[in-house]
UniProtKB/Swiss-Prot annotation:
Pfam family, one: Pro_isomerase
Knockout mutant characteristics: Stunted growth and hypersensitivity to high light.
Subcellular location, principal: plastid
This protein's name: Peptidyl-prolyl cis-trans isomerase CYP38, chloroplastic
Organism: Arabidopsis thaliana (Mouse-ear cress)
Compartments reported by the entry: Plastid, Chloroplast thylakoid lumen
Annotated GO MF terms: peptidyl-prolyl cis-trans isomerase activity
Tissue: Ubiquitous. Lower levels of expression in roots.
Length: 437
């Protein structure tokens, strides 16, 4: 493991001299997906306080934030060090509009489809989240309006939605529509019975049906990867993995399983590389190597190498920087959006959500990503709605969709017991692990 250390720079925070608290509103036992966090047999629901102070960490992410407004700054302690890979520079990239922060919503909007009818069903169902911000049972009246609007829109646009299904997925798509209709009726019964606590779980369920409908509109893989990367492991679609982490020195929680959805539609090379490494069990038994309140990071193997050594070449396998921009049909490779002069471009899968997953790389080598990955721990106050410091500079390729809040509990030295692909492995093309096996 690399041993050179470098100082981290000063960073800035908007509207706060401390990081705000982030509430966790669910138990970490998640039976429908068998995704859980546990402390023996005790179900654990917690409230996370302010982030921990920065500490020595495994690889360098220089979090210098150039924001668009005047803000107070917080200097890092003098002994905060990191090895020289990778670094996040201090140039911000503009995005427009208020950010969507829910990881599953981001994944739905990132699908390569163009069907206005299903998007108009999706929106009022997502708006239930805002309705639940109303105090008490009064929120239920707003929830009812959301659901009735979605139901009407579904009936009005059903023929357009059905016509949008890929031929091979029509049966499954129609099944998802039936489940969505039944789910919305269940939600109206919940509202009628004034069971506020049952709304959010049912919303999550019916939005999964919406996501299923939208995925059934994708007909194959929508573009060709550039020839120079075509023989690399490629994720041509999506895959889900479960990452089980053994948490040390925490009396409240012993282990946690994080569900991660990997988006190969928008980052096929990056996501394919990761799935291939997962199937090689590369990360099994590896420690968390950085956890400082901004990122959780791992992937630096033991020894002098800073990435995955391909046994067929005995060299580090690297992947290019891969950024999909809204309105483009294929990703940009090898250059940051800043280098391309696309300062106001919006990326399809942004660093908006707590638990955004991205590929780490060296500061001045865009195509140096290999096996080191990080998850962003970020409250919305860290960046104003029209400024994002990481989009277009690092390749996002997935989001933690279950138990993401518990990423903040991970510490250096906690152990990844295993990462397993639970769906979508059939979307991996050119898997090198099979050749190695």
């Amino acid at each position: 493991m690399a041993a050179a250390f470098a100082s981290l720079p000063t960073f800035s925070v908007v509207n706060s001299s401390r990081f705000p608290r982030r509430r966790i509103g669910f138990s970490c036992s998640k039976k429908p997906l068998e995704v859980r966090c546990s402390s023996g047999n005790t179900r654990y629901t917690k409230q996370r306080g302010a982030f921990t102070s920065l500490k020595e960490c495994a690889i360098s992410l220089a979090l210098s934030v150039g924001l668009m407004v005047s803000v107070p700054s917080i200097a890092l302690p003098p002994n905060a060090h990191a090895v020289a890979n990778p670094v996040i520079p201090d140039v911000s990239v503009l995005i427009s509009g208020p950010p969507i922060k829910d990881p599953e919503a981001l994944l739905r909007y990132a699908l390569p489809i163009d069907n206005k009818a299903i998007r108009e069903v999706q929106k009022p169902l997502e708006d239930i989240t805002d309705s639940l911000k109303i105090a008490g049972v009064k929120a239920l009246d707003s929830v009812e309006r959301n659901v009735r609007q979605a139901s009407r829109t579904l009936q009005q646009g059903k023929s357009i939605i059905v016509a949008g299904f890929a031929e091979s997925k029509k049966d499954h798509g129609n099944e998802m529509i039936e489940k969505l209709e039944a789910g919305m009726q269940d939600m109206l019964k919940i509202v009628e019975d004034r069971k506020r606590d049952a709304v959010a779980p049912k919303q999550k369920e019916i939005l999964k049906y919406v996501g299923g409908i939208e995925e059934d509109m994708v007909d194959g893989f929508p573009y060709e990867v550039p020839e120079e990367y075509r023989n690399m492991p490629l994720l041509k679609g999506r895959a889900s993995v479960d990452m089980k982490v053994k948490i040390k020195d925490n009396p409240n929680i012993e282990d946690c399983v994080f569900r991660i959805v990997l988006d190969g539609y928008n980052a096929p090379v990056t996501a394919g590389n990761f799935v291939d490494l997962v199937e090689r069990h590369f990360y099994d038994g590896m420690e968390i190597q950085r956890s400082d309140g901004f990122v959780v990071q791992t992937g630096d193997p033991e020894g002098p190498a800073e990435g995955f050594i391909d046994p067929s070449t005995e060299k580090t396998r690297t992947v290019p920087l891969e950024i999909m921009v809204t309105g483009e049909k294929t990703p940009f490779y090898g250059s940051t959006l800043e280098e391309l002069g696309l300062y106001k471009a919006q990326v399809v899968i942004p660093f908006n959500a707590f638990g955004t997953m991205a590929m780490a790389r060296e500061e001045f080598e865009n195509d140096s990503g290999s096996s080191q990955v990080f998850w962003l721990l970020k409250e919305s106050e860290l960046t104003p709605s029209n400024s994002n410091i990481l989009d277009g500079r690092y390749a996002v390729f997935g989001y933690v969709t279950d138990n993401e809040d518990f990423l903040a509990d991970l510490k250096v030295g906690d152990v990844i017991e295993s990462i397993q692909v639970v769906s979508g492995l059939e979307n991996l093309a050119n898997p090198s692990y099979k050749i190695a096996g």
